[in-house]
């Protein structure tokens, strides 16, 4: 069941979202050749705790880290480790979130490690544009399929596919709330988006 959020709820989500965003941004600034994903994880956890939050991922479903650190072709949920050292030319997707006052934040971004190939730059540009197009579709009155269609059609137009096994999701008091938000779909299909959906 989709839980619509009140304006007060959304203010609570903005607080945890702001902390999650800043934790991700600063962790991303540390990305460089030679750093371990464990060091990134440690920094992110310390930052979240220092600013009154609790790492949202640590212990969630048994996950051991504060960040998911997925390198190159690893799709998602990469486990941070002292042995996973970033190399020049890698790309790393960092996914993290903070819980503040019972509200959960969750965000991810893919960072370049030093200089990356033109192919990897193109991938990052297309996925960034897919995100922007998806956000444009996330308005009351549109359908869930409009979001997925925007992502899928733009990716395919540029020669990429989408991962069907993992989806975006609602968020609130729990990390994963309804609805699931696939990166594929058809215009005008699926649930109608309403004010208060997050």
Report residues per predicted region:
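Active-site neighborhoods and metal-handling regions in enzymes and metal-associated proteins
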Residues: 1-198
């Amino acid at each position: 069941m989709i839980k619509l959020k009140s304006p007060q709820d959304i203010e609570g989500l903005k607080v945890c979202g702001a902390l999650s965003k800043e934790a991700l941004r600063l962790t991303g600034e540390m990305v460089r050749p030679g750093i371990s994903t464990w060091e990134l994880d440690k920094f992110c956890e310390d930052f979240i705790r220092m600013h009154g939050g609790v790492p949202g991922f640590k212990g969630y479903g048994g996950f051991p880290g504060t960040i998911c650190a997925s390198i190159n072709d690893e799709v998602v949920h990469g486990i941070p480790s002292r042995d996973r050292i970033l190399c020049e030319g890698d790309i790393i997707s960092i996914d993290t979130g903070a819980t503040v006052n019972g509200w959960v934040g969750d965000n991810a971004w893919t960072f370049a490690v030093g200089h990356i190939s033109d192919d990897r730059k193109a991938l990052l540009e297309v996925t960034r544009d897919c995100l922007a197009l998806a956000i444009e579709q996330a308005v009351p009155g549109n359908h869930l399929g409009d979001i997925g269609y925007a992502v899928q059609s733009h990716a395919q137009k540029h020669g990429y596919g989408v991962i069907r096994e993992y989806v975006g999701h609602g968020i609130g008091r729990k990390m994963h709330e309804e609805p699931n938000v696939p990166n594929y779909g058809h215009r005008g299909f699926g649930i109608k988006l309403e004010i208060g959906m997050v």
